[in-house]
Amino acid sequence: MTVQHTQDSQDLTRGSISRHLVRLAVPLVFGNILQEFYNTIDAFVVGRFAGQAEFAAIGVAGTVMNLFLFALVGGCTGFSVLFARAYGKEDMEELRRQELSALVVGLICTAVLMLIGLAGMQPLLSVLQTPVEIRAYTASYLRWIFLSLPAAFLYNLFASLLRASGDTKAALMVLAAAVTANLLLDFLFVAGLSGGIEGAAAATALTQLFSAVVCFIYLRCTHPELTLSRTDCSLSRSQLCTTMRFGLITSLHQCSLYLGKMLVQGAVNTAGTDVISAYTAGTRIEGFANSIGSSGSSATSILTAQNHGAGRRDRVRDIFRCSLCWLIGLGIFSAVIMYIFAPHTIRLLLGSEGNAFGPAVRYLRLVSLFYVFCFAGNTFTGYYSGTGRVMLPFLGAFGHISIRVVLSWLLFPYLGLNAVALATGIGWICANAFWSGMKLRERSVAHFV
């Protein structure tokens, strides 16, 4: 079946690879930055118009909420590889069957996550040693979030379909609308109606539903070839198993990264408020650089998956080389900017008078020296995901985060915050060594899995 490409979707199997990478990555970068704003809106509004206890509860709830959301987003990342591969083959019937399979698997897994969250919320808050005075607020917020998980999944599923077709702009526009809607609803429910933390949670839940509906309507209107119909309602066991495997591995990938960061935070928390503040400021600055690298990885994955699906093996190899050159260059550029402007960016967050300023600058400068490995690693993860070998990015990331956690805890008593930067860099180097070894092995056998 020949695909009639819409104005916003892209046939990525032809044309300039560099141009495709840039056109895919730029909206993804802005999307990641918008996501950072989206994640802080509730805290900002509650901090301004509710009590200190409710503000603290947002922080605790965010730790739990992000773990569940990372599981959903990670799963949809795996589904998007299957979508892009079918799109590259111009087989819309297969794509819609993959979509149905992802919908069934994803909704079942989301329902399980929702039930686990609702049933295990109180024990989890106890494990996190949530203070009694904010536990009720935290539980109230999380209850709304868990109930809105199906809407969050549907939005991410529809957005992954758009990205798989090369239409990354639409997903960005929907996210921008969601950020605006969440901000307005937060002010209405929290400031206007004095709803407190429950009002903020309701605003977030309604925004998730709004995002899913808008994304679905856009798909039906502009990408009818991606929309399910009654004739597509057939499932096979092999397809369900493939969908589950891709979704589960990429979900574990995202969750392992987040859990690793939480464990590193545990090591930092032993050093007192000043060091915690320094680490928080440093990682906030890192977040902007990481948004570029992760967007490059997603763009590489989409571009690779379409061409791999179309059988363009020579072009897949060119995509890897082009992405590696681009991301190494951007990694060097980001490292230079982070190193030179570390004092200025940290000063914006902490000022320059407190005890946290010096450790934050030293941390940011040390970790920046390794950023070329971070960015190069994004090429490998995008490439391997796009060719269907989703286990390799997971294994590399799991190894990286394990090294990062172990070395951070071992070296922190001697090196302080610099131990975390050094452990992070060593983890990136080891992950790249693993992926490079697998790439050399691939070249020797000249084989795609």
Where are these predicted regions, by residue range?
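Short alpha-helical transmembrane segments in multi-pass integral membrane proteins
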Residues: 1-25, 83-148, 192-248, 304-370, ...
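Transmembrane helical elements of multi-pass membrane transporters/channels
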Residues: 23-42, 144, 178, 207-211, ...
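Short runs within selected transmembrane alpha-helices of multi-pass transporters and secretion channels
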Residues: 76, 145-163, 174-179, 200-215, ...
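Residue-level signal for short hydrophobic patches within transmembrane helices
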Residues: 14, 18-37, 41, 64-71, ...
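Small-residue-rich hydrophobic transmembrane alpha-helices
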Residues: 55-115, 152-171, 278-342, 374-396
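Helix-terminus/linker motif at the lipid-water interface of multi-pass membrane proteins
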Residues: 33, 37-56, 125-132, 188-195, ...
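Hydrophobic transmembrane alpha-helices of multi-pass small-molecule transporters
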Residues: 67-70, 182-186, 212-216, 288-291, ...
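Transmembrane alpha-helix boundary and packing residues in multipass membrane permease domains
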Residues: 28, 32, 44, 81, ...
